[in-house]
């Protein structure tokens, strides 16, 4: 069985718990998820089976959409409700306009400092392991992109909800923390749900607790379909043969579409055969990942 199953992970489970269940249902070992969701978070977690594990890194590059709830006036060491409360402040004087202006100031490409309670490593040690020992170290800010923040609901300063569309590597907990710091009252994330990962949506996801062999076979998505978020280009069979053999082709006659530099495309031969993912640079076009079904 080769393909991707769009799973909905419930709170209280690790992402590896989900993989273990899929392995058991599918009766196969070659299974992997496409980006960790914390146990306290729920939501969309595409899981790759068989040859589809080759495309895990590409699915992880997808834009993500998260539905997040945050509370103003409280800061914890983990930036969420799992941690120890470090300080509490009165946030009742903060107006809705101030909150909206602050939230919208984070749109675009920004520098974000990852939280201490994260799986990132420093000198070979995971940050959360240092944090549990009471050690805080300097973390370099990383470039991330917030594409949009929509459906903002301010029920009270204790409950703000919003949908955040962001790039790979974004820590929503850190976004909540940074919003609180900019408002000078602190903030903590109180709930997190991933509602979309590229073309994989919450509405089409199978709850992991409902997964059966029958549902898996019915809803598994082909490798080709799972890469729908990448634009498609078509080459003729002559050039397709060269690409299959790992040749970098420098010939603009190869494709009829406008092909940008350093951008991944789904590559098809003009007979409809899907070859894989390819990229153009100054020296030509080459398949980065051959995915043809032999």
From Swiss-Prot:
Gene Ontology terms describing biological process: mRNA pseudouridine synthesis; tRNA pseudouridine synthesis
Keywords, comma-separated and alphabetical: Isomerase, tRNA processing
Active site: 38
Catalytic reaction list: uridine(55) in tRNA = pseudouridine(55) in tRNA
An MF annotation (GO) of this entry: RNA binding
Protein's UniProt keywords contain tRNA processing: yes
SUPFAM superfamilies listed in its UniProt record: Pseudouridine synthase
Entry keyword annotation includes tRNA processing: yes
Domain of life: Bacteria
Coiled-coil features, chain-numbered ranges: none
EC number: 5.4.99.25
PANTHER family recorded: PSEUDOURIDYLATE SYNTHASE TRUB1, TRNA-PSEUDOURIDINE SYNTHASE
UniProt-listed HAMAP family: TruB_bact
Family the entry assigns: Belongs to the pseudouridine synthase TruB family. Type 1 subfamily.
Cross-referenced NCBIfam families: TruB (TIGR00431)
Job of this protein: Responsible for synthesis of pseudouridine from uracil-55 in the psi GC loop of transfer RNAs.
UniProt-recorded name of the protein: tRNA pseudouridine synthase B
Species this chain originates from: Clostridium perfringens (strain ATCC 13124 / DSM 756 / JCM 1290 / NCIMB 6125 / NCTC 8237 / Type A)
Gene: truB
